[in-house]
Amino acid sequence: MTTQLAKFAIGQVVRHRVYPFRGVIFDVDPVFSNTEEYWLSIPENIRPHKNQPFYHLLAENEDSSYVAYVSEQNLLPDDTGQPVGHPQASMIFESFRGGHYTLRPGIGH
């Protein structure tokens, strides 16, 4: 099994390729690392292959904030330059400048 380098970085704001939500990346797995139940819950027409980076996002849409787990192929850079309004963002990140968040000291792997 080969893994690829992650295209997106922790602290980067991204949006979903299909669904209307955006978020800030707070962790990344080199390959799919969630449950088979979760895998099968992804609509088959957009179900990605498992051998690619998967990102943990503090996500938001028009109605709510939540944590999302999204494959690299389903993400695009967010070019709005706007911060994410997720209530937990300030617990993980200390600042937002130039469209990118900076982790708080001591947060990380």
Language model regions located:
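Mixed-charge, Lys/Arg-rich low-complexity intrinsically disordered regions
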Residues: 1-13, 18-22, 29-32, 103-109
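Generic alpha-helix detector with strongest preference for long hydrophobic helices that associate
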Residues: 4-6, 38, 77
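Intrinsically disordered, low-complexity boundary segments flanking structured domains
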Residues: 12, 41-46
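Residue-level recognition of conserved beta-strand positions in structured domain cores
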Residues: 25-27, 59
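Short, solvent-exposed secondary-structure boundary/capping segments
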Residues: 32-41
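Intrinsically disordered, low-complexity, charged/polar segments
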Residues: 46-109
